[in-house]
A protein has these predicted regions:
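Bacterial N-terminal signal peptides that target proteins for export
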Residues: 1-9
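PEST-like low-complexity, intrinsically disordered acidic/proline/serine-rich tracts
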Residues: 9, 20-344
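Hydrophobic membrane-targeting signal helices
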Residues: 13-19
Length: 344
């Protein structure tokens, strides 16, 4: 009997320290070589705004009732008419939402903003030099165009002389939500992570971008080599994957708050991203933007990604994209009208 009790106690102790796969218990799966397993497809869309709305003032978290009401408002908005009241206005956007993501989730902790530092939930102020450059650019719309979508070109405020006068995502160069850094968007908000012993691949659905991140401690490439996605190097900090990126091209922005805004230039950007498993179904993603040329202080964003069954299909951008061709053709037609008028 005593032997049976001892064996039973030993089994219970063993079970107590064995990992389980229960959802929500903070269990972190491992790869065969012992690293935290971040692999899978992760949906990073969220209703939580980047910056804290003014009505919440210094409050960092929503109540359950407020969170429920926010979700309900979004669900009701799906039935709104997208057409302009004036039938003569542009019909762009006047169609249903079959191609957009159905976003009904807030951040798991019900935060009022994705920005967690500074505590006020707002983007830091621009430096004086960055502000002056921003104002000068908006007055002239000169190249390079760093915005993902340039509304001035779409609405004829800045007639397109060439494709360089359109936004970067319209030219299939940079997706505003896929980053880096990664932010929720209207659609294609999926990240797939692949791992080997020496590398991690971060593949985003938008613009089908793949960042291959070495983990072997090699230095960054020369600052003379500038890239749209920067030069990334990774390492493990406990169970958290840390990815640091520098050497961004000045042709892109330092930060993209949304699809139409571009803040600063990427040349001085130092981006630090942190990926960690919360549980089987949840991945936490944090990033810190440190750009002393653009912002008066660094800021940090935190969001949670939910596991998705997938698969991720290849993102078609140039294929069947007649919008850019038609916009350029329209600009040439306007020029002919002006030239004919002047020559009379």
């Amino acid at each position: 009997m005593r032997r049976l009790l001892v064996m039973t106690a030993a089994v219970l102790m063993l079970l107590g320290v064995m990992p389980t796969t229960a959802v929500g218990q903070g269990v972190i799966p491992k790869t065969p070589w012992g690293a935290p397993d971040l692999q899978g497809i992760w949906d990073f869309n969220t209703l939580t705004p980047l910056e804290r709305p003014s009505e919440f003032e210094e409050r960092e978290f929503l109540t359950e009732e407020e969170a429920s009401q926010m979700v309900q408002t979004v669900l009701e908005s799906e039935g709104w008419d997208a057409r302009y009241s004036d039938p003569q206005q542009d019909v762009e956007g006047a169609y249903n939402q079959f191609w957009t993501d159905r976003i009904t989730n807030l951040s798991a902790d019900r935060r009022t903003s994705l920005i967690v530092k500074p505590r006020d939930g707002q983007l830091p102020a621009l430096t004086a030099a960055a502000y002056e450059r921003e104002q000068a650019w908006r007055a002239t719309w000169q190249r390079p165009i760093r915005a993902p979508v340039l509304l001035a070109a779409l609405f004829g405020i800045n007639p397109a002389r060439g494709p360089e006068d359109f936004g970067l995502s319209e030219r299939c160069l940079v997706g505003y939500s896929s980053g880096p850094p990664i932010n929720g968007g209207t659609y294609n908000s999926n990240l797939q992570i692949f791992q080997t012993r020496g590398h991690v691949v971060l593949y985003t659905e938008m613009i089908h971008e793949a960042r291959v991140v070495p983990l072997d401690g090699r230095p960054h490439v020369s600052p003379a080599i500038r890239q749209w996605l920067g030069d990334a190097r990774g390492h493990w900090d406990g169970d958290t994957l840390v990815v640091e990126s520098v050497n961004f091209t000045p042709k892109r922005a330092s930060f993209y708050p949304n699809a139409t805004d571009a803040v600063g230039s990427g040349e001085a950007l130092h981006l630090t991203e942190r990926f960690s498993r919360v549980d089987i179904e949840t991945l936490r993603y944090e990033y810190t933007v440190d750009d002393p040329v653009t912002f008066t202080s660094p800021f940090t964003v935190s969001l949670t990604m939910q596991r998705s069954t997938g698969p991720i299909f290849e993102y078609a951008c140039h294929e069947g994209n007649y919008g850019l061709l038609n916009a350029l053709a329209g600009a040439r037609a306007q020029e002919r009208v002006v030239n004919n008028f002047v020559s009379r």
